[in-house]
Amino acid sequence: MSKQETYIDYNYIERLNAVNLNRSYDEEIVFIMTVGGVVKVKKELLVSVSNYFKLITKNQSNEITVSFQYESFLDIIKYIETGIVTIDLDNVENIFSISCSKAIDFLKNSCIDFMSKHITDSTCVKIYKIGFSNGCFAVYNDAIAYIRKRFTKIETDILLSLSLFDLRIILKSGELDVSSEDDVLLFIIKWSRHKKSNRRKSFTLVTEVLRYNYLSIYGKYKLTKWLARFGKNNNVELNENELPRISYQHRFTNRRYTMVTPSSFSINMLGNVSVKNELSIINSIAENHNPYCGSVLMNDILYLIGGINKSLDPVSDITSVDTRSFIELHTPPLLHPRKCPGVAIFKNRIYVVGGIGYDGPLKTVESWSPGEQQWREEVPLLQPRFNPCIIGTDNDLYVVGGISEDDKTIEIYSYEENTWSIGNAMNYSHFGGCIAYHHGYIYMIGGLSFIDNIHVFTMVEKYNPHSNKWTVEKSLPFPRFNSSLCIIEDSIAIIGWIYY
């Protein structure tokens, strides 16, 4: 199969021909300021390919600044001018990132089609990372399924580049195709040696993904010797309740066997852990909910909303627990399955905004108030957004970022008018940042900001809702990413995730 494919947008070409027939001599030009150069494009063409550009050019001047490289954006301009794009393994990542962040649907779908056709042993990890970083479930789910199926065939050096987070998703699955559980152990040991920072993280993999009961006697011996090198043999808790993986379960079906006891190897097994305090109860309930969920505390009740299941599908499930009685409560499911939503309290209702559904980022918004039998459909966003920062003020709901890592845009929902509008963009992006409403101002704190193409995690901005202006405030003393935030007395407290 060719590693280069050309995609033609026939519907767009028809619109393009109509525009050319009606060409005027005073056509308006938009200047796109990229990293490394300036790209010129006709405004009429630019706004026809994406609602994002339509909104940006409507509310700003004819200069647009993007954080993408000049060469990468030339492929986008070629499509805008001709309706044709040629995709290969070298340019697919940049084209896909731009099309996702700027909502160019044809290019996005073309990249998805190209990547799904070209997942191989050498490209699977790259395609997985492209899909995940752009929030595209279809891409990274296909890549993960491929990696699990070909795990022992893919070159180890390629798999060693995966992070702890990536490996948790891949190795925990019962569909991981290995000849024995020893294969998993040997890979974890190799991964621990690949980088010094992997050593501590590898103990997490051992406790969370390794199916100890199905190691061979040699595998258990190997594990014990490896742990002993770091003085961990008595401090690692292993889960003995997992079933065998599908690829080797036939060897354990209808068979009585004697397992070597953990005490033989001086390893403590994770049994039925008794709940020792109230916080443990909440933690236990929370850990059983789906990852990538939204969370909010309302009237002393903790709500965990949406997320993904073990098959990595977005879900509509909600877990709610009374933090006073520590009793789990019933809450109706969402109308739309979603992971990575924005969640906030506004007008005594829980608002769930955007997120990622089965087909990618969502515009949908829904709300619910305790006592209601189902969620209520609300006016959708102007742009699909996932993992945005969201905060309510007296009469407005603010949704910040969520289109891409470098997104600086905000949308404002007016409760009185029941409409969304585009607000004044931030000075910097704050991907993975946190948000607060304090003394009449909105604060965007930390997260990933791009300054002269350098990654910065300490920026703080303050927004005045009355003047619709952002100002840059004093930076954080430590870089923060995906931190938590709370108001304590008269101060904003940032908790966790110092980023280095």
Swiss-Prot record:
Keyword field: Kelch repeat, Repeat
Sequence ranges of the Kelch repeats: 301-348, 349-395, 397-440, 441-490
Family under the similarity heading: Belongs to the poxviruses Kelch family.
Ranges for domain BTB: 27-89
SMART domains reported in the protein's UniProt record: BACK (SM00875), BTB (SM00225), Kelch (SM00612)
Gene3D superfamilies membership: 1.25.40.420, Kelch-type beta propeller, Potassium Channel Kv1.1, Chain A
Name of the featured protein: Protein C13
Organism from which the protein derives: Swinepox virus (strain Kasza) (SWPV)
UniProt cross-references to PROSITE patterns, sorted A to Z: BTB
S-S bridge residues: none
